[in-house]
A protein has these predicted regions:
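A short, polar/charged loop-to-alpha-helix boundary motif
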Residues: 378-394
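Flexible phosphate-sensing "switch/lid" loops adjacent to ATP/NTP-binding sites
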Residues: 1-176, 191-352, 358, 365-367, ...
Length: 495
């Protein structure tokens, strides 16, 4: 079954790069572009806009490679606190190095690193020395009292004037960071101040994929962005400045709308006039023009909202949040007429769990067929589901054993009697190792292994929270997993 696409990725690459070129020309040949969101692996965009490739942003920038240089901003405050990226589990300092390696891997010139909010933090000084030993240029930008509202001070020699001027040589300076709150926008505006002092024409623009400004406020794509940022208190809203200036309704998010009057005044103080009449004007995002099937992206976005709902429920069950985000996403679901059972794989999994009294799982195949997996003495429900899916995709009869019990038994013995595990059932990674070994001599097992790539993009649901290992295995296989917010046992610790 061919996946329906809702987004024209090639059109996007061409249109987006051309629009950035025109913005560079608008400002006389130099543009500071604040790059928000994920550059290398925008999986959220690829899920809600089927056809959008996770690496589309970096591929788009690659079309401008000869004009681009990269500046990475990292907050000295975050370095001092050893702040960690939640999705990667690494510090902002380490992620700065990862970003630089990643950009260089694509052939980009990384100009420098800016330490923002620098006030002599020892960790920042150590990091600067490390970067300089690696041959990178490092600049310091300092805290400004009254930022961002004391504009006369900010746009003066005692404000931006105290910051070190970042030497750049190309027409498009992409300012990125390891995470939010790193000071990307402040770096851009500080540079505009210094460029203007030197008589160099330069401008600022912002690139973020979401919310998509030329879709309706309550469009599922934009609501999916609200669901994704429910823990950040971001909300989409009509851009009142754009409506007043042009009589056109566009969508932006609250933080950009709230700060725009300040930014406009800063632009006016730096160069005499503001090039923008609204926060929408500042953006360069062309994604909305590349949607080719609205029905497809609406359906995909609704699925994403449901996945976010279950993810936040499980985070709350684990004690990682206070549950506020769950209530916010529930409100978004009500606006679209969704309930938790709107997710097609939920009811089949719950039905098997109710019938057997044990954890169960369900997965939707590419052709729409829903398969289930139940808990047995040999396999957990997720492993059983995976075997059933591989049999189905490979056209292997259900009665054929892909892994003989005689193969599973010694693995269980090793787990329990040697390694001290209490659960003898095979996890997904253990199952796949056993299946791969069997594939050496068994054509059916070999055919099953060959089906693994077909699982990418499939939806799955389990009636209990899985182990971190099984969750990670599903993630690596590209399966979009959700779980009921409960554990298999009533124990207090779930390792």
């Amino acid at each position: 079954m061919i996946e329906r696409l809702g987004f024209d990725n090639e059109k996007y690459l061409e249109m987006q790069s051309e629009h950035i070129r025109s913005r560079i020309d608008q400002f006389g040949g130099k543009l500071y572009l604040e790059f928000g969101g994920k550059l290398f692996d925008d999986n959220h965009a690829s899920r809600v806009l089927p056809g959008f490739h996770p690496d589309s942003k970096i591929r788009m920038l690659s079309q401008l490679k000869d004009q681009v240089e990269i500046v990475v901003a990292v907050s000295a405050v975050d370095l001092e606190k050893s702040k960690v990226r939640g999705d990667l589990g690494i510090t902002y300092g380490t992620d700065t190095l990862r970003l630089i390696d990643a950009f260089r891997g694509f052939g980009f010139q990384v100009a420098s690193v800016v330490l923002t909010r620098f006030s002599g933090q020892p960790a920042a000084e150590i990091f600067q020395a490390q970067l300089e030993d690696l041959g990178l240029r490092v600049y310091r930008h300092y805290p400004i009292e009254g930022y961002p509202y004391d504009i006369p001070l900010i746009v003066s020699e005692e404000g931006y004037g105290k910051n070190e001027y970042v030497e750049t040589s190309r027409s498009l300076v992409v300012v990125t960071a390891p995470g939010p709150g790193s000071g990307k926008m402040a770096v851009c505006l500080s540079q505009l101040y210094h460029e203007h002092k030197r008589g160099i024409q330069a401008g600022y623009a912002k690139y973020e994929t979401f919310p998509i400004w030329n879709l309706p406020l309550r469009h599922p794509v934009n609501l999916a962005y609200e669901a994704a940022t429910a823990d950040l208190n971001d909300v989409n809203m009509i851009d009142p400045f754009h409506l007043e200036a042009y009589g056109v309704t566009t969508v932006n998010y609250n933080r950009d709308v709230e700060i725009f009057p300040v930014l406009k005044t800063m632009f006016e103080r730096i160069s005499g006039t503001s090039p923008y009449q609204s926060p929408t004007d500042m953006g360069v995002n062309m994604a909305g023009y590349c949607i080719v099937d609205d029905e497809v992206v609406c359906q995909a976005s609704q699925e994403e909202i449901l996945r976010r709902f279950y993810a936040e429920e499980c985070r709350h069950r684990r004690g990682q949040t206070d549950g506020t985000a769950v209530y916010k996403i529930e409100l978004l679901m009500k606006q679209l007429g969704l309930t938790p059972l709107s997710r097609s794989v939920v009811s089949p999994a719950l039905a098997v769990a109710e019938r057997t009294g044990d954890p169960a799982a369900a997965m939707e195949m590419p052709d729409g067929t829903i398969l289930t997996g139940k808990t047995s003495e040999l396999l957990g429900c997720s492993s059983a589901l995976l075997l059933n899916a591989l049999k189905y995709l490979g056209g292997i009869p259900d009665e054929i054993q892909l892994i003989a019990p005689s193969v599973i038994a010694p693995v269980q013995d090793l787990k329990v009697n040697v390694l001290g595990n209490k659960n003898p059932r095979l996890h997904i990674d253990e199952l796949l190792v056993a299946l791969s070994i069997c594939a050496v001599t068994d054509p059916n097992a070999k055919r099953a292994v060959q089906q693994l790539q077909k699982l990418r993009g499939c939806e799955a649901h389990t009636t209990v929270i899985l182990s971190e290992g099984d969750e990670d295995s599903f993630r690596r296989l590209g399966v979009r997993l959700t779980s009921e917010p409960k554990y298999q046992t009533s124990k207090l610790y779930h390792g």
